[in-house]
Amino acid sequence: VHCMALLPHAREGEALPKRQTLYLLHGYGDSYTSWIRKTNLERYAAHHNLAVIMPDAQKSAYTDMTHGGKFFTYIADELPGKMRAFLPLSERREDTFIAGFSMGGYGAFKIGLARPMQYAAIGCISAGVSNDTPDTVALRELRTGGRPLKDTEEDVPASIARAAALGKDAPRIYHTIGQEDFLLSGARETRDLLCSYPGDPFHYIYEEKPGKHGWEFCDGALRDFLQWLSPAPR
């Protein structure tokens, strides 16, 4: 499986530290190279002194596929350890984040909430817990072979409920979508679900801004997410 890593340069006179790390997930029809090619990620990450790991997940919806790779297990359980073995990445939960665009935003919810003690924050751009479109419904049988996800680790609403029970230890969530996005209704349903838990355990931020479903909106949303994540450069 392909994966791309972006590491900030060590500053002059600085010993090579273990970096804060963002796992950044691509959308349907994109790949592990899309973030570098289609956004200003490299400049944003350098500003925040942040390492970024971008795995490829094909069109899996970050699922353990019946007819394909086990992408949920790979990214949730295998990839972090492998990356830390090769690269100077922090092992601390407070230094580890996950985010994504479109299908990757759904994947960030799925993985981040299934492993809430692994990530301090989750970012979802242009997506929601349900991203059903004719294309994704048609692919579901290929991904799951009819296997129900309810009450499994990949049941996102159930993962939300379990993570919310952590109270102040639940990961923070930043969620944004364009007002002209075709996935807007699913994002609003997700907003309503996350806001239904008393006490705001996720310190949930939801923003709708002018824009459609595409990289122009995504680039600005990525910049805003990283600013929310780390307001001051490190």
Role assignments for model-derived ranges:
Residues 1-234:
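Non-catalytic cap/lid and distal C-terminal segments of serine-dependent acyl enzymes
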